[in-house]
């Protein structure tokens, strides 16, 4: 009985601290465009553009946990409380370029796009780049207010599409988009047939086959 009581007490704080997606976010995506610039000895990060798009297709559980370490991290905090409400890791082409000899004598800039869930209230976003020893090379923190008139709204006009495989729950599935690049409008029937064949090929293999 003592062991069970102790276990219940130990588990209580974890349950109390469990984060609910709907407490801080709405079902939309905030796209943040950054510019990474610099060379082997000096780097900088700048915000380029903010966009909001319909629906959020990323994680809704374990929002503040990192899946893998990566060479960089994006951290979202609730501005009012300072609580971490979303984190993710990444590795970029810019960081890969910094490991090349060219970066010792040249300065370049790279465009980078990050997606986070759209917040209900003002957030503080911190982006940091790390070296191979996980030491922070450069970092940027900036605020995002959902009411900011400079945030562009995109993707609200419907784009023609056809569903090949309907998920039972669209919030807990992998979304695959087949893009008709290289096909003319008259070749849409051919494209759809090719897409269906590609889709069937995917579901012929595990783990997709048994989870279809």
Label each region the model flagged.
Residues 18, 88-90, 191, 199:
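Composition- and surface-driven signal marking solvent-exposed, interaction-prone regions
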Residues 24-149:
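Beta-strand-enriched, solvent-exposed domains that form extended recognition/catalytic surfaces
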Residues 149-209:
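Fold-level signature of zinc-dependent metallopeptidase catalytic domains
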């Amino acid at each position: 009985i003592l062991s069970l009581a102790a276990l219940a007490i130990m588990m209580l704080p974890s349950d109390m601290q469990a984060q609910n997606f709907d407490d801080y976010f709405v079902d939309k995506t905030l796209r943040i465009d950054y510019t990474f610039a610099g060379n082997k000895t000096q780097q900088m990060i700048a915000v380029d553009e903010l966009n909001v798009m319909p629906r959020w297709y990323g994680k809704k559980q374990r929002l503040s946990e990192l899946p893998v370490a990566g060479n960089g991290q994006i951290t979202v905090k609730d501005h009012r409380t300072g609580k971490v409400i979303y984190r993710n890791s990444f590795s970029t082409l810019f960081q890969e370029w910094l490991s090349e000899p060219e970066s010792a004598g040249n300065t370049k800039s790279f465009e980078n796009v990050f997606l986070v869930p759209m917040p209900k209230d003002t957030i503080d976003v911190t982006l940091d780049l790390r070296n191979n020893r996980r030491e922070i090379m450069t970092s940027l923190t900036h605020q995002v207010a959902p009411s900011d008139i400079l945030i562009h709204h995109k993707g609200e006009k419907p784009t023609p599409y056809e569903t090949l495989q309907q998920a039972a729950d669209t919030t807990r599935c992998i979304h695959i988009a087949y893009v008709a690049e290289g096909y003319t409008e008259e070749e849409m029937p051919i494209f759809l047939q090719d897409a269906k064949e590609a889709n069937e090929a995917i579901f012929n293999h595990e783990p997709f086959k048994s989870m279809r």
